Amino acid sequence: MADEQNLDAQAQDQAAEAGAGDELTTRVQVLEEQLAAAQDQSLRVAADLQNVRRRAEQDVEKAHKFALEKFAGDLLPIIDSLERGLDLSNPDDESIRPMREGIELTLKMFQDTLKRYQLEAIDPHGQPFSADQHQAMAMQESADVEPNTVLKVFQKGYQLNGRLLRPAMVVVSKAPSPATPSINEQA
């Protein structure tokens, strides 16, 4: 009987060890899953942090690049006025020649300064119309050029660092309409 009790005790011990082994295996699996989830979350947080840093750097870069946008926009009417003044003055009139030369020099210095800050004029005369950079003020029939070609520029457009600041206001060509026959030709 003592042997049976020893066998029962050994069986119980083995069963307890097997149960404890199953518990340990289950516990190890749970801990491994938690570890994997924590590592995954850590990677996601690191990736999010890197994305936030990259976006912040891009925002700062854009802020530096386009900080002059409002100021440059306020300068455009001044450039327009100087150009209009030159266009309206007679280059052959000796009485205004010194003033005209002064305006020309001022305008050139102004344009050179703006170019240094990547503010560039859009003067599309003779180019195909582009809705991205031009604003059509009128359409005019023309057999001399292809349809949708800029015939006249009312006001130059400007770009700052490649971004449109003001579209060019233009007259765009269209194909001539077919001549309508007169009443005599129809008969």
From Swiss-Prot:
Claim: Disulfide bond is one of the keywords in the record: no
GO BP annotations, alphabetical order: protein folding
Gene Ontology molecular functions: adenyl-nucleotide exchange factor activity; protein homodimerization activity; protein-folding chaperone binding; unfolded protein binding
SUPFAM superfamilies for the chain: Coiled-coil domain of nucleotide exchange factor GrpE, Head domain of nucleotide exchange factor GrpE
GO CC, one annotated term: cytosol
Localization terms from the record: Cytoplasm
Name of one Pfam family that matches: GrpE
UniProt entry keywords in alphabetical sequence: Chaperone, Cytoplasm, Stress response
Biased composition annotated in UniProt, kind: Low complexity: 7-22
Lineage: superkingdom: Bacteria
Region (Disordered) location: 1-22
Keyword Chaperone among record annotations: yes
The protein's assembly and partners: Homodimer.
Family: Belongs to the GrpE family.
Classification via NCBIfam families: PRK14139.1, PRK14140.1, PRK14150.1, PRK14151.1
Role this protein plays: Participates actively in the response to hyperosmotic and heat shock by preventing the aggregation of stress-denatured proteins, in association with DnaK and GrpE. It is the nucleotide exchange factor for DnaK and may function as a thermosensor. Unfolded proteins bind initially to DnaJ; upon interaction with the DnaJ-bound protein, DnaK hydrolyzes its bound ATP, resulting in the formation of a stable complex. GrpE releases ADP from DnaK; ATP binding to DnaK triggers the release of the substrate protein, thus completing the reaction cycle.
Protein name, UniProt field: Protein GrpE
Organism: Pseudomonas syringae pv. tomato (strain ATCC BAA-871 / DC3000)
Gene behind the chain: grpE
